[in-house]
Amino acid sequence: MDIKNVHIKNHEQTAHAPSTLEKIRKVKQGGKLSEQTKTFGSTYRRLDPNQPSPTVTRSGYRDFIHPFEDRMLTVRELACLQTFPLDWEFTGTRLDSYSSKRKVTMTQFGQVGNAVPPLLAEAVAKAVSEQLLDVIDEK
């Protein structure tokens, strides 16, 4: 497959406000903005390419800065951290939006953050299946 000619779904970058870019630029690899400003908690955290990723959460678009570029991760990049295959498509809006009844709809970022990583789910299912088969075989 020629990757140059493949459209990767859910890989749209956010157009950051100048004030957000200013915050992002301050954060070094593996660091957090809160280490410099004593605010923002765990948000604005730049990934270290040599370390495991922190847990991806529903609000992940505010948590993870690309390790090499001054921008937040895309839905697709977060999905890759969660082990979703490249052909998996997330639907709905990327960021929070409100319906006419003022209920928050599930966003693409929310779908990724709320998901059990597929490879983790597979490993758990295999382990449970093996244990159940062992119990059945014992009877």
Curated annotation (Swiss-Prot):
It comes from the Bacteria. SUPFAM superfamilies: S-adenosyl-L-methionine-dependent methyltransferases. Pfam families: DNA_methylase. Its EC number is 2.1.1.37. It catalyses: a 2'-deoxycytidine in DNA + S-adenosyl-L-methionine = a 5-methyl-2'-deoxycytidine in DNA + S-adenosyl-L-homocysteine + H(+). Residues 38-58 are annotated as: Disordered. GO terms for molecular function: DNA (cytosine-5-)-methyltransferase activity; DNA binding. InterPro entries: C5-Methyltransferase, C5_MeTfrase, C5_meth_CS, SAM-dependent_MTases_sf. Gene3D superfamilies: DNA Methylase, subunit A, domain 2. Residues 1-135 form the SAM-dependent MTase C5-type domain. Keywords: DNA-binding, Methyltransferase, Restriction system, S-adenosyl-L-methionine, Transferase. One of its GO terms (biological process) is methylation. Belongs to the class I-like SAM-binding methyltransferase superfamily. C5-methyltransferase family. Heterodimer of an alpha and a beta subunit. Corresponds to the C-terminal half of the enzymatic domain. This is Type II methyltransferase M.AquIB. It comes from Picosynechococcus sp. (strain ATCC 27264 / PCC 7002 / PR-6).
